[in-house]
């Protein structure tokens, strides 16, 4: 892992040169994958998320018509090009999100008013979750607020960064699937079948099956070195919801419209059936809360632009 004890002294283009070069080397050789993954990791400040450099490439997005459990929203399949970027090694954790709440005073909306699930709820707030669980009970706007705070934090520690938005953001839906597949073409990065103890879902054969969240390091990482891309907690993407991929961009950017109220979530959660725990599976959640919605099972991880 690349740690930066003095961020102000490291030019940003040099910081990511090693990330990009080692990512390219990873695609050219099957030797030393574990070390190559570690070489692509970086963290821009002591309490910033650990990021993993993802190599540029093309992939077939969506599911084939014969994939077991396929939904029409996962097609038509198409070739998508992805620029090199970085993605969080883990979901943002409860501890990381609490740091954000304490720093900003941000108050997420309740995600289940019937059961009283909310951040800051006396006696039963989400702050009581384990610190290394994925932070959940979050709407898309909460994830965006965290990203804005993280960008302000990094800009403060790195004044040489170009002015303007970024570099952190939510991943596009295409980036998310590309990273989840990690070069594989099967329904899940480990194969077609759900197997046993590969992820946390309702039928994944793990100790947490349909019971509760697992910690973010509970299962093996995928070939890109990313943990928990499938199962445990849904993850927000930048994209607005569309019922299929007709007219979708093929350059990896997010497919958005101004003020859309519905956004795409990916990956499945601890109570999802295996059919939803596939690389191509996608679902929908609103940005305006409600008595009960998917946000009670939804968190996020951050992406980062690379020069």
Question: Across the structure, where does each feature detected by a protein language model lie?
Answer:
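Residues embedded in well-ordered beta-strands
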Residues: 52, 79, 187, 235, ...
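Functional-site microenvironments in short loops/helix caps that host divalent-cation chemistry
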Residues: 60, 64-69, 117-286, 291
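N-terminal pre-domain segments of enzymes
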Residues: 37-43
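A short glycine-rich, aromatic-capped structural motif
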Residues: 43-116, 136-142, 231
């Amino acid at each position: 892992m690349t740690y930066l004890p003095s961020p102000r002294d490291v030019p940003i283009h040099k910081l990511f040169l090693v990330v990009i070069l080692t990512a390219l080397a990873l695609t050219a050789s099957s030797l030393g994958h574990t070390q190559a993954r570690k070489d692509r990791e970086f963290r821009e400040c002591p309490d910033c998320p650990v990021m993993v450099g993802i190599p540029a490439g093309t992939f077939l997005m969506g599911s084939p018509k014969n994939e077991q459990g396929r939904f029409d929203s996962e097609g038509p399949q198409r070739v998508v090009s992805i620029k090199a970027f970085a993605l969080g090694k883990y979901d943002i954790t409860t501890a990381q999100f609490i740091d954000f709440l304490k720093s900003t005073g941000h108050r997420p909306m309740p995600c289940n008013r019937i059961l009283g699930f909310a951040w800051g709820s006396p006696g039963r707030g989400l702050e009581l979750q384990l610190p290394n669980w994925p932070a959940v009970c979050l709407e898309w706007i909460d994830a965006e607020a965290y990203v804005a705070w993280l960008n302000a934090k990094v800009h403060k520690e790195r004044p040489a960064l170009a002015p303007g938005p970024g570099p952190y953001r939510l991943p596009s839906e295409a980036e998310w699937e590309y990273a989840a597949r990690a070069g594989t073409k099967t329904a899940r990065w480990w194969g077609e079948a759900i197997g046993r103890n590969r992820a946390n879902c309702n039928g994944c054969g793990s100790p947490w099956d349909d019971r509760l969240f697992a910690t973010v390091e509970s299962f093996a990482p995928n070939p890109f070195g990313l943990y928990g891309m499938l199962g445990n907690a849904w993850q927000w993407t930048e994209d607005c919801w569309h019922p299929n991929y007709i007219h979708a961009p093929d350059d990896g950017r997010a497919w958005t419209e101004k003020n859309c109220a519905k956004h795409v979530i990916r990956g499945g959660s601890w109570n999802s059936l295996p059919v939803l725990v596939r690389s191509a599976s996608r679902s929908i959640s609103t940005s305006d809360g409600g008595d009960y919605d998917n946000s009670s099972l939804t968190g996020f991880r951050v992406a980062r632009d690379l020069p």
